[in-house]
């Protein structure tokens, strides 16, 4: 796979299923949550990926019954996520480890699909500079980056209601999750998300959905990639009990 941004196939998939996705009164719904290229294309983790304590391979899972709180501060406000290890032990262990080591700090929400999802977490091409913006080269590739490793899939045992936080992945490629994640904006997204792929569910937004909605309402490219034109960075990401 090339390093260029891969066109999401959400609306194409919906059409192939013989149905038109209707979310929030809009037909089409934009692109599905999609990760970057396979880890096999990267010989080492991106040098800008957080701190030296970040994992370089799939970290230990969270145990069933173990929960964590991930707090994301952005210029738009604060988003608090309750992560539940019982939903997806492998994915939650990975997400919490990346949040704790600083990987997500300075990384943007790069895709905005109104009425559907917002997506972020590309630490390879989605990390802002000192000016709070992406470089021109990164802006052209944001959303196509990868972590340097991928993690195994977890089974999905619940559904994608508004506020659900889940891992993005490459369409039709099992075990392709890395660092990118998305937040569901609308209950109506659930059926189409399940039809398209199983995306490991990390937990749910416990506070700050108004902030998520505000980010989703910002301008995007208006094409199936739904790239944020002025992507919002995660200025601080911390983990608590």
Give residue ranges: language-model regions.
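Cyclophilin-like peptidyl-prolyl cis-trans isomerases
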Residues: 2-13, 18-241
